[in-house]
Amino acid sequence: MRHQKSGRKFNRTSAHREAMFRNMAASLFKHELIKTTLPKAKELRRVAEPLITIGKVDGVANRRLAFARLRDKEAVGKLFVELGSRYATRPGGYLRILKAGFRAGDNAPMAYVELVDRPVVAEEVAE
């Protein structure tokens, strides 16, 4: 019985799972919008939201803590410079998960994960 066991395994080893979410969080911070499967998106929220909370208070200790969890200098820099100030007054709920239908190959439920309050750039429509 797996009572009180939180988190999904995704049929991966713990190291593979940790690396996968580390890379997904770094990609989310860099691009502010990623597409993944719905279960991975829900689990990514448990990794990314505490990192954004850490990014709200800039300091050497917090930067080192974030780097230990992300292992990506560019993502950590953006986390503290841009995202930390953007969400300084928001008490949580930094991510939005939008369902995006089902994948063609295996019918897996897909979702977009985006940072709320991200600047939306209007794309020019070719006539």
Swiss-Prot record:
Protein origin, superkingdom: Bacteria
Keywords: Ribonucleoprotein, Ribosomal protein
GO cellular component, one term: cytosolic large ribosomal subunit
One annotated GO biological process: translation
Family label: Belongs to the bacterial ribosomal protein bL17 family.
The protein's assembly and partners: Part of the 50S ribosomal subunit. Contacts protein L32.
Name assigned to this protein: Large ribosomal subunit protein bL17
Source lineage: Bacteria, Pseudomonadati, Pseudomonadota, Gammaproteobacteria, Lysobacterales
